[in-house]
Regions:
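Alpha-helical scaffold elements lining the catalytic groove of polysaccharide deacetylases
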Residues: 107-128, 141-184, 196-202
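Gram-positive cell-envelope targeting signals
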Residues: 1-3
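Structural recognition of the beta-strand scaffold that forms the well-ordered cores
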Residues: 50-52, 75-79, 100-105, 132-137, ...
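Catalytic grooves of carbohydrate-active enzymes
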Residues: 59-61, 171-220
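Short, polar loop motifs at secondary-structure junctions
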Residues: 138-142, 220
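Charge-rich, solvent-exposed alpha-helical interaction surfaces
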Residues: 5, 9-12
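Sec-exported extracytoplasmic/periplasmic mature domains
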Residues: 69-73, 95-99, 122-129, 150, ...
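Active-site beta->alpha N-cap acidic-glycine motif
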Residues: 13-119, 123, 222
Length: 222
């Protein structure tokens, strides 16, 4: 019965996305304090951009999803095990919108992180009826866990806003400059807090204006 209910929810949500879109988040208007956009090279070198969101802070998660839906973009959302149950409604929305779901685990050792990943994997399969090997783990543990079959997120750009004092325009400028130094692929990590929700519409706009393609993050392509 639970499986049928979730299947119906995902089907209804997917159908609702095919109707004419309604306005989502309105991009913040620039204020006089916003830094002007620095001119960037027009040639992006076809750098693929992947968007990852760590969901230990989910206060802005619904707004993050609104921004991605409005721009027809996808990302991967990394949840700690307890967050999967706490945000189950938004989890179903994420799955129904074509995003990927991964696990966030940060143990003191690789063994401790592995146990957290296993717990999260069981929780996700129980409430979401899906499995994943995508994981956001401490840098020093990534190689060991990859050898065990986990597909670990390799952050190349920390795109989490410094705080509410940083304007969306200034933040987007800084992220674009960091991407410019990447080759082939850039892995942007944001969180799902209110500040990330605030800056994301402008960041997506700037990525589009610079012709950076945002690729769909999959377990077979990260």
């Amino acid at each position: 019965a639970a499986s049928n209910l979730i299947s119906r929810y995902l089907r209804e949500y997917s159908q609702s996305q095919q109707s004419p879109p309604t306005p989502g988040i309105r991009p913040p208007t620039s204020s006089g304090t916003d830094a002007p956009l620095q001119e960037e090279p027009e040639d992006t070198g076809n750098t693929l951009v992947y968007l990852g969101f760590r969901c230990d802070d989910t206060q802005g998660l619904a707004q993050v999803l609104d921004a991605l839906d409005a721009n027809n973009k996808t990302g991967v959302f990394f949840f700690p095990a307890d967050g999967l149950e706490r945000e189950d409604d938004l989890l179903y929305r994420i799955l129904g919108s074509g995003h990927s779901v991964g696990l966030l685990a940060e143990g003191e050792t690789a063994a401790a992180t592995r146990r957290l990943l296993e717990k999260g994997s069981q929780t996700l399969e129980r409430i979401g009826y899906v499995r994943t090997t995508l994981a956001l783990v401490p840098d020093g543990q990534r190689s060991a866990l990859q050898e065990e079959g986990w597909v670990c997120w390799n952050e190349t750009v920390n795109a989490v806003p410094a705080g509410s004092q940083t304007s969306a325009s200034t933040h987007a400028n800084a992220v674009i400059r960091k991407i410019g130094s990447q080759r082939n692929s850039a892995y942007l990590t944001l969180d799902a807090g209110t500040d990330s929700a605030r800056v994301l519409p402008i960041l997506l706009q700037r990525l589009g204006s610079r012709s950076y393609p945002i690729s769909v993050p999959l377990e077979t392509r990260l």
